[in-house]
Amino acid sequence: ALKFDFGSLVADGAPLRVVGNLPYNISTPILFHLADYADKVKDMTFMLQKEVVMRMVGDPGTEEYGRLSVMLQYRFNMRRVFDVPPGAFRPAPKVMSSIVRMVPRPAAECTAMDYALLGKVVTAAFGQRRKTLRNTLRDYLDEADFAALGIDPGLRGERLSVDDFVRIANHVAAKGPQPA
């Protein structure tokens, strides 16, 4: 699943509907791989560990909000549909599960000039959660850049919206070549 070309399943331009019970230990890499096919998908519905779903749908300023939240919410409108208790399985797992529905956002709403750069900026911002943006994004932005963006460099990444991250990435992309 991590190397499969999901685009090869698209027939006559009909979008895919992806449904599954993802292996909890590799769910995040699978979700990132599937995000690359958002333009070929009508919707996706998965059962995952509840903790992962809460991170996927996390809001800015919450403990759950992080890299997974930003990168998936950039590409998808998501909602937790319902929880599945351990007792629904035999043998019962030690964790609660949740069902999440993911619908790709229209391409017009996905305005990052460079998706890979967006990923790098988000990864940097959340790489050290307790550090401020001034420190985590110092390879990308200086004080003048923060001022131009209207973003307080004293904030932490968890306080920024998905759109804030897109604005930062687009600003950085417009400045030219970036660090490796």
Regions found by a protein language model. Name each.
Residues 1-123, 147, 167, 177-180:
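Catalytic cores of RNA-modifying enzymes
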